[in-house]
Amino acid sequence: MQRTRYSLAVFTLGLVLAGATSASADPFFFSTGAPDGRMGAASRPESHGKLEIEAADDFILESQTHLEGASFTGLLFQGGPGEIRQVAVEIYRVFPKDSDVTRTSGAPIFSTPKVPTRVNSPSDVAFDTRDSADGTLRFTVTVLGYDFPAANSVIDGIHPIPDQATKGEGPVQGQEIRVDVVFDPPIDLPADHYFFVPQVTLQGRGGNFLWLSTPRPPLAFLGDLQIWIRNADLDPDWLRVGTDIVDDATPPTFNGSFSLNGTR
């Protein structure tokens, strides 16, 4: 009987400690804000003869964080929400982490034969991923508007130097959607600077998901970078959507519309 009471006491103490640990976790939330209609950047897994495209925007974690979900807002160009077949999220660290620096020119520019610079770009390879195709991500789609315009777009015009400065592919319109995702399992990230890459596959060859931009600045956070993009032909390098592709006299810069939630 004494041994049983001791075991029960240990078990109860374990539950109390577990509850205390759970209760001590602080909620985490990060958001770049609502779309501004300036830019739509394609971002999709490889499928049906389409090259993979990755559009990436950054966020900073000041402590170990347990990411449980995310939301991102985009435009369905020549497609509808019923045609969405796959959603994926990739997390990258900032170059030169997870990257082969020897293939670049080195400091301070870190250029390659394909791109002007890798400074402040995402790394060569992803740090972690979640994908509805393998069951590690669940998603829901909400239509926010049926005729949302974006003043410029980047879809197919992602080229290595010297042809990178296409100025973009012009205005587009389509359904504005918000994609809410749950990570299963959650993504555990140590304190660091990261890039968030949302990707959406639409059925068929014509449609594309375009990630919508948000204002930058004055709403940028300290250390904020800008949207970078690449396709499978440019991999492992990246281009800046503003500055490299839309290289106006005063180059624009863009953030992507997304939010993250979890605990830390």
Which residue ranges define each predicted feature?
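Short, surface-exposed beta-strand/loop patches at domain edges
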Residues: 188-193, 197-264
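Extended extracellular/luminal ectodomain segments enriched in beta-structured repeat modules
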Residues: 62-71, 82-84, 191-192
